[in-house]
Amino acid sequence: MHFAKLGAIGLLGSIICAYAASAASKVIIDNDGLTDLQVLFALQAKQQILGVTAIYGDYTLDDSLFLASDVLSTGNLTYCIPSFAGAAQPLLRTNNTFQIWQELYGSYVWQGYWQPEYETANTNNESYIYNTQISAAQFIIDMVKANPNEITIVAAGPMTNLAIALSIWPDLAKNTKSLVIMGGYVDSQIAQVTGGDFLNDMYSDFNLFMEPEAAQTAITADWPELIIAGNITSQVYPSQSLYNGIIARAGGMANIESDSGLSYAKQFVGNGTLPSGSFPFWDEVASAIAAWPEIVNSSYDAYVSVDTAYDSPFYGSLRMVPADLVPKKGVRTAKASMITGINVAMFYQKIYDSLTAEYSSYCMNGTIITPSNITISNTTNTTNTTGFY
């Protein structure tokens, strides 16, 4: 069941949001399963989140909308950060063609909402809030037109919403400040072959292969800046020492359990013990790069495209060429900054800061309440992280 925002509430949310961050840099988060830290990183960096656009992918569109609403409502952020429904399925690819391709070229460990045993994220059939007045693609267009050359889009799911928006308004990309994507793995076959199903999944380019044609359309558009957070997003993990640091900064587990202002911390640490098989900070790393560009400590430039040949074993994979070998005809490419390393100590510190702050007043007056200024060192990995590239 969906509860749409009334027009007056949507307008009020826009006014409040403008008040809360009128002078901030602007960001739109496009994702198939929003996480807490994606929102909190942007707020901590004093970015203005214009909205969240949901899409199919890891989850169905309905589940993606539910997760976005859940993330925002936890911090009382629903009425100043609107969310919008995007594509419910790819434009071209179907589950049938997806399965046939796997029979021809090999299976993916993770298939998102096409997983045969897929289970809804909204297990209790809860109601949730999102804006039904316009689509995600139209929202992106409207915001870029209203804020030319000011908006960073963080795309951490399949890129169908962006492809639709670009088909409606081809000048969208060149009027945007930058596009940061989560995806675009390169040179990862050794890790996939030798690391078992877990590592194979970690380096499967899900956001590209769910709809390669949309990914190619979006990635090779005329963005002033294209930042690809690929391999690096599969190399930064949560740790027990990270959990311990969050708990210490929040004043202990008892305080986390009793203080409603620490709801994000509570959701993150659970019972205080790191679960086995924890996944890396995929989308969070991309959002951190968008929030704090200085977190990047190594990268290189390449001209990129996405393989859109269905009869190719690399269908849906990112391809790269150097500047002097860019195709002059045929395949369209775009210059991208390929991120290969971040300051992991800084990343963990941003997690501490984000999860132990209190956001319930943000929509009313832009206030984020933080605990006393404590710096917790993470002993698991405070070095810079680089990976396969």
From Swiss-Prot:
Keyword line: Endoplasmic reticulum, Glycosidase, Hydrolase, Signal
Family: Belongs to the IUNH family.
Taxonomic classification: Eukaryota, Fungi, Dikarya, Ascomycota, Taphrinomycotina
Protein's UniProt keywords contain Signal: yes
Signal peptide: 1-23
GO molecular function: purine nucleosidase activity
Naturally occurring in which organism (per UniProt): Schizosaccharomyces pombe (strain 972 / ATCC 24843)
Compartments (UniProt record): Endoplasmic reticulum lumen
Protein name: Uncharacterized protein C800.11
Protein's GO biological process: purine nucleoside catabolic process
Main localization, broad class: endoplasmic reticulum
GO cellular component: cytosol; endoplasmic reticulum; endoplasmic reticulum lumen
InterPro entries assigned: Inosine/uridine_hydrolase_dom, IUNH, Ribo_hydro-like
